[in-house]
């Protein structure tokens, strides 16, 4: 693929839906919020390359360490490897697809998903609160890639810390983006400096993120866009190589 003529999109889930950093041929990057992943795709050309920080391709059974991609990339990240969490089985992801109206219902659904996850994993493993929090977004992309196989050649899973590592000559970031749930300014500055070395203007990165997205969501989407460019140019690498496939034929790999 040739990135010179491709629209490149980097996406990450956020409170308002999805944050996307995009760049067309010869244009500066822009940032926008979309309420759904379908809306994001509808706003991009059919030949755009999209890299997204979200698991794609679900296992029927989960082994120790999660899917193959997670097990492969963790050792590269050193102290940052905790940012890569294991994905449970497809059955656990779809154990409860309700729209939760109370916190009690949310926790009850988490318990149900954990029960299914333990029954479909070896050793038995429940679902972390962090993983459960993005289940609905994983299902969004999963449903689209099942219904539209054409998307499988232009929507790619990536991971911010793996992407930063690849851009940093395969050296993991030294500082965390967050400490105890709060943004770590030093870690953010480290990543902004790396993004600037790869073509971003600091004024773009220093702007407040759109309403409904956090500052770290913005940087994650920004590095995803660079990964989309690497995929388009053929310089990105999938983990594993070649990618696996899930029960629906959806490719399973983290690209960076």
Language-model regions, residue ranges each:
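RNase H-like (RuvC/DEDD) metal-dependent nuclease/polynucleotide-processing core
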Residues: 2-8, 13-256
């Amino acid at each position: 693929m040739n990135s010179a003529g491709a629209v490149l999109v980097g996406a990450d889930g956020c409170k308002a839906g999805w944050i996307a950093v995009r760049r067309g041929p010869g244009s500066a990057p822009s940032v926008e919020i979309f309420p759904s992943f379908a809306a994001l795709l509808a706003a991009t050309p059919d030949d755009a390359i999209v890299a997204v920080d979200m698991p794609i391709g679900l296992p029927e059974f989960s082994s120790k360490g999660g899917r193959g991609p997670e097990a492969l990339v963790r050792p590269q990240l050193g102290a940052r490897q905790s940012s890569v969490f294991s994905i449970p089985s497809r059955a656990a992801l779809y154990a409860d697809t309700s729209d939760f109206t109370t916190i009690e219902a949310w926790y009850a659904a988490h318990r149900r998903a954990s029960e299914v996850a333990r029954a479909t994993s070896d050793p038995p493993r429940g679902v972390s609160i962090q993983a459960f929090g993005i289940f609905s977004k994983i299902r969004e992309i999963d449903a689209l890639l099942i219904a539209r196989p054409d998307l499988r050649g232009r929507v790619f899973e990536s991971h911010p810390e793996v992407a930063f590592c690849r851009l940093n000559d395969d050296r993991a970031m030294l500082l965390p983006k967050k400490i105890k749930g709060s943004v770590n300014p030093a870690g953010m500055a480290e990543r902004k400096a790396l993004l600037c070395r790869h073509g971003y203007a600091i004024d773009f990165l220093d702007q407040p993120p759109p309403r409904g997205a956090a500052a770290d969501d913005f940087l994650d989407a920004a590095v995803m866009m660079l990964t989309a460019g690497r995929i388009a140019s053929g310089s990105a690498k999938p983990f594993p190589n070649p990618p696996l496939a899930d029960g629906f034929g959806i490719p399973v790999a983290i690209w960076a």
